[in-house]
């Protein structure tokens, strides 16, 4: 967790490269940042890869944004980052968000339908922005860059919250059910 001002934003986003994942929104938001001291690593593959590469080139962000493809072991990428962004239009159970939190990364997520709001406690455990709103996302990123303490405090709440999704917690719940039969 970052306690001081961040020298360089090292952003990560993980998921299938498809329209509903909102990677175009992240790219647009990054193109609007005042600071150019950032990098974005996107892990995943999918039908939008060519379009995203074109967008990255159009915004002249080739040196800032890397599409690294699908990776089985994502841990080393999470460890290199200091911020996670999820811009999905809708999301069932966002495993990548839980993984990011478990790697001590503060998260900025769209307020999409699905499990994101539950995991980050309706914004108390991370920052939320309106779906498809690259302007608002850009402001959230800038806010984190200027004052990482605020989002890192929210990370603490998220880390407590995601414990209920651990395997150990599920085993305890099943044991309780079987003990009451």
For each predicted feature, which ranges?
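A conserved mid-protein helix/loop that constitutes part of the nucleotide-sugar donor-binding site
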Residues: 9-32, 43, 47-53, 95
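Nucleotide-activated donor-binding/catalytic signature segment of Leloir-type glycosyltransferases, i.e.
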Residues: 53-69
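Aromatic "clamp/platform" in nucleotide-sugar-dependent glycosyltransferases that forms part
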Residues: 70, 89
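A short alpha->beta transition loop at the rim of the catalytic pocket in nucleotide-sugar-dependent
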Residues: 82, 104
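Short acidic/histidine- and often glycine-rich active-site loop of Leloir-type glycosyltransferases
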Residues: 99, 112-123, 127-128
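Short hydrophobic beta-strand element within catalytic cores of glycosyltransferases
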Residues: 106-110
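Conserved acidic donor-binding segment of nucleotide-sugar-dependent glycosyltransferases
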Residues: 122-134, 143-148
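C-terminal alpha-helical cap of glycosyltransferases
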Residues: 167-181
């Amino acid at each position: 967790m970052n306690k001081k001002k961040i020298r360089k934003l090292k952003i990560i986003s993980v998921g299938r490269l498809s329209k509903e994942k909102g990677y175009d929104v992240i790219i647009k938001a990054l193109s609007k940042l005042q600071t150019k001291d950032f990098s974005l690593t996107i892990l995943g593959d999918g039908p939008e890869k060519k379009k995203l590469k074109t967008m990255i080139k159009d915004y002249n962000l080739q040196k800032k944004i890397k599409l690294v493809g699908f990776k089985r072991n994502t841990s080393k990428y999470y460890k290199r980052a200091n911020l996670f962004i999820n811009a999905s239009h809708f999301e069932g159970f966002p495993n990548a968000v839980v993984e990011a939190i478990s790697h001590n990364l503060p998260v900025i997520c769209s307020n999409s339908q699905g499990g994101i709001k539950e995991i980050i406690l309706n914004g108390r455990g991370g920052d939320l922005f309106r779906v498809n709103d690259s302007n608002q996302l850009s402001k959230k990123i800038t806010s984190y860059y200027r004052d990482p303490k605020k989002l890192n405090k929210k990370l603490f709440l998220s880390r407590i919250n995601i414990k209920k999704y651990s395997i150990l917690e599920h085993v305890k719940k099943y044991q309780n059910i079987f003990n009451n039969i």
